Design a protein with these regions (language model features):
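Hydrophobic alpha-helical connector segments
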Residues: 40, 45-79
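Hydrophobic alpha-helical segments that drive targeting, anchoring, or assembly
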Residues: 16, 62-69, 81-94, 115
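Short amphipathic alpha-helical interface segments enriched in basic and hydrophobic/aromatic residues
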Residues: 3, 21, 46, 50, ...
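Helix-turn-helix
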Residues: 4-36, 40
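Hydrophobic/aromatic-rich alpha-helical bundle segments in the mid-to-C-terminal region
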Residues: 84, 88-89, 99-158
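Short amphipathic alpha-helical segments and their helix-coil junctions
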Residues: 50-62, 91-104
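Amphipathic alpha-helical interaction segments
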Residues: 36, 67-71, 112-119
Length: 158
């Protein structure tokens, strides 16, 4: 039982410690508790996903990406001030860099596109019914986001 199988809210310190083969007081000692542990994990998980870049097609969010979204949402719920610090916006920054490098876009445009893609993924994972998103539509939305980036890249290079 770990974050791969369950949401962060459903795991206890004892369960996390058992999976990590450590004593549960160690988590509190070294990380200050479950929240601190997850704050340490988020950048590591985000970096692993970000190094892969944007896939050419994206049928649906991977299980790994779903876990990242749920962890991010849980962290935001537990500590609303956490993502106010610009250095903690790891996912947004990674997407911005991908858009800058892949499409040669200005940083401000790349940030907006990264935020749009994050909104799509977060909505698809957390609240697909709120916008009537069908699973097969996710790939169409992703393709549209890439097309928008390509068109913006063409317009900024003129």
């Amino acid at each position: 039982m770990c974050i791969r199988d369950r949401s962060p809210a459903d795991l206890t310190l004892r369960q996390i410690a058992q999976h990590a083969k450590c004593h549960h007081p160690d988590i509190a000692t070294y990380f200050g508790g479950k929240l601190g542990l997850y704050k340490e994990l988020l950048p590591i998980i985000a970096e692993v996903i970000a190094t892969r870049g944007l896939p050419p097609t994206f049928a649906k969010p991977s299980a790994e990406l779903v876990r990242l979204v749920r962890l991010t949402a849980w962290l935001d719920e537990q500590d609303p001030s956490y993502f106010r610090n610009a250095s903690e916006r790891i996912i947004r920054d990674a997407l911005t860099n991908i858009y800058v490098q892949r499409f040669n876009l200005p940083i401000d445009v790349a940030q907006l596109l990264g935020q749009r893609l994050m909104a799509l993924v977060f909505t698809a994972v957390l609240h697909p019914g709120s916008i009537g998103l069908q699973e097969q539509q996710f790939s169409e939305h992703f393709a549209l986001e890439i097309k928008i980036a390509q068109l913006l890249a063409r317009n900024t290079s003129i």
